[in-house]
From Swiss-Prot:
Keyword Cytoplasm found: yes
Protein name as annotated: 3-phosphoshikimate 1-carboxyvinyltransferase
Compartments where found: Cytoplasm
HAMAP family: EPSP_synth
Main location as per UniProt: cytoplasm
Binding-site positions, phosphoenolpyruvate: K23, G97, R125, Q172, R345, R387, K412
E.C. number: 2.5.1.19
Entry's family note: Belongs to the EPSP synthase family.
One CC-aspect GO term: cytoplasm
Annotated 3-phosphoshikimate binding sites: K23, S24, R28, S170, S171, Q172, S198, D314, N337, K341
Record's subunit section: Monomer.
Top-rank taxon, per record: Bacteria
Amino acid sequence: MQNSLDLKPISHVNGTVCLPGSKSISNRVLLLSSIAKGTTCLTNLLNSHDTQHMLNALKKLGVRYNLSDDKKTCHVQGIGGPFHLSEAISLYLGNAGTAIRPLLSVLSLHKNNILLNGDDRMHERPIGDLVDALIQGGAVIEYKKNKGYPPICTKGGFLGGSIFLNGNISSQFLTSLLISTPLALKDTTIFIKGNLVSKPYIDITLNLIKIFGVNIEHDSYNVFYIKGKQQYKTPGKYTIEGDASSASYFLAAAAIKGGSVKVTGVGKKSIQGDIEFANILEKMGATIFWEDYSITCTRNKLNAIDLDMNHIPDAAMTVAILALFSKGTTIIRNIYNWRVKETDRLSAMTIELRKIGAIVEEGRDFLSISPPIFFQYSSIETYNDHRMAMCFSLISLSGVGVNILNPNCISKTFPSYFKDFLSISKI
């Protein structure tokens, strides 16, 4: 395993990048295909650690699938309903929040005895609000270590009914319930307490659920109404669009050191909220050209921005790097949920930005960033967080190089990132 990657100063970027499949969509449709009636052909599936954890879990749960040699096409034979297991099993899900959270709800639909576990960081990522919601619906769930965190064991028993869910920590909790509750024995009404974070990710979930034949109604994202005793049905074939969060690094590179860079796989017809990043780039001064399935960015002078970025928390990390190349002080607001991601991203971003000379103020839920007078060559700690590694690769566009520690952490979502980044770069 590579301990570090030294990126030399890059003088210019130009070219086209074909994006890998979206992580958020890949793991959602793998699960939906598994519990749907019929066989689904998934194309442009993301090949990464997170999707592999989901595939391994589904196989252990009895799902049959055929994965192509390049791991981008998968034929999934749906079981037509909840998972029924006659014996106790354990599922290891690494640090894949997009796997452990939706699986917990679906596995709570039927009498089971299933342990869901993960790596050390997963044991620090909260899941208590989701567990509380499932218990309200009749589920029997036990914490095996620390209350509110994995590992956890579900014994099943979820029926539905009225559920109150905190919405201010992670949208994945609601996504989990929205996927599982149509299969419950009773109708379910979900009442959201507080402000729902990352609403665009809920839109992804609702869109995909509809493609698999189920409609869910909601009242301005405050109350969700789900009919029980439904069945998901295969759409036959589904092509996963490119990962919009991953697009942000290449578009940002063009804004900083272009040339022009075109990303394919996302565009005007994307269902992912993170394409909003391109609009933010435009507000900062870059030139953006949209097509149905591509976005092109061309360099221009960048100005600082002050925005609430709760709706695009992943792509907001790239804005923190753009701040270093912009005139003025950039403020990224309402991003408390950075603290419960792969690492505490607010703290990690602050520490690493200061290493390279930036002036940073870290608040409970915001970052204020002013560019450095001089960029300093640094070794960047990635905290085993794929997005930290990809974000800080852009420091190589500053005129100084950068050393990325534990670069292999990108395997969580984008194993070929550095190869693709260097393919558009000129030293």
